[in-house]
A protein has these predicted regions:
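A catalytic-pocket lid/entrance helix-loop region that shapes and gates access to the active site
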Residues: 123, 127-151
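Conserved HGGG/HGGXW glycine-rich cap/lid loop of the alpha/beta-hydrolase fold
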Residues: 12-65
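Conserved acidic catalytic loop of the alpha/beta-hydrolase fold
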Residues: 74-91
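Conserved hydrolase catalytic core segment
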Residues: 89-132
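Catalytic histidine-centered segment of alpha/beta-hydrolase-like enzymes
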Residues: 253-266
Length: 274
């Protein structure tokens, strides 16, 4: 694994991780409050089957935190500029939550550069059925992010907080978050994301993305956790109908499959792309 920085033509510094391998390129896009290296275990299980990139998206990790609307459209334009900067013409995209929204927009707007789109954990229903109730849920999630703890006296304190916040994650995955998504701040530790920017991005979970799905021509895989708390099988099949060529593939787990079940996610990606 190589760790690098690149300055995009819009001035954004993007920090990213690269696992050299065979073509095609596979781009991993993390969720809100996530970080590029959270795909590390999945990338290692994939081996050299793909040339893999995992990005710290704007507002996250060691990438820049400029002003902006932090919409999927803005992130998708960052992705376009990133691919150009690193010399990738076409790629398979795999994203979870925020990363999935970015992929949905990118695949529709840049079909000539998208070989396939994998939605890890599945898309948010609120992006396809933005009912009043769904919007209330989105705004509540955004508010919870604003109120979340972001500074800790020690790594042990951060780990204890994450255990309560993410009870489904493996202990190894929680420790990975502590090791790679915190930075020293004074005498303690702080998360490596801007929670105000993240909260703004979360508010876009009420944006209607159906128009993008309807324009997409590449194959789409909804990689749903088989005991998902976010998306039932029936809901996944219903949302899949908005794409011309989408399939639903169940993977052992709940939602953050790259943290809960990296080998299972890697196997599903391999089967889908064969």
């Amino acid at each position: 694994m190589d760790e690098k920085d690149v300055i995009l033509s819009n001035g954004l510094k993007v920090h990213y991780y690269e696992w050299p391998g065979s073509k095609p390129a596979l781009i991993f896009l993390h969720p809100s409050s996530g970080y590029g290296r959270m795909w590390e275990a999945t990338a290692n299980h994939l081996g050299s089957r793909f040339h893999i990139y995992a990005i710290d998206q704007r507002g996250h990790g060691s990438s820049g935190r400029p002003d902006g609307d932090y919409s999927a459209e803005e992130y998708a334009d960052d992705l376009r500029l990133f691919l150009t900067a690193v010399g990738v013409d076409k790629a398979i995209l795999a994203g979870q939550s925020l990363g999935g929204r970015v992929g949905i927009v990118f695949a529709a707007v840049h079909p000539e550069r998208t070989m396939g789109l994998a939605l890890v954990g599945g898309p948010h229903l609120s992006n396809f059925f933005p009912t009043r109730e769904a919007v209330l849920g989105v705004l509540a999630a955004s508010q919870r992010m604003l109120e979340s703890e972001t500074e800790f006296a020690s790594k042990d304190a951060a780990l204890a907080y994450l255990r309560k916040l993410r009870p489904r994650d493996r202990e190894e995955a929680l420790r990975h978050r502590v090791e790679h998504n915190l930075a020293q701040a004074g005498t303690g530790w702080a998360v490596k994301y801007d929670k105000v920017r993240v909260a703004l991005g979360l508010a876009h979970m009420a944006d209607d993305l159906k128009k993008y799905a309807l324009r997409t021509t590449c194959p789409v895989a909804i990689l749903r956790g088989n005991h998902s708390s976010e998306l039932t099988l029936e809901e996944a099949k219903r949302v899949a109908g908005f794409w011309k060529n989408a399939s639903v593939i169940d993977v052992e787990g709940d939602y953050a499959l790259q943290m809960e079940n990296p080998p299972g996610l890697a196997e599903a990606l391999i089967r889908w792309t064969v």
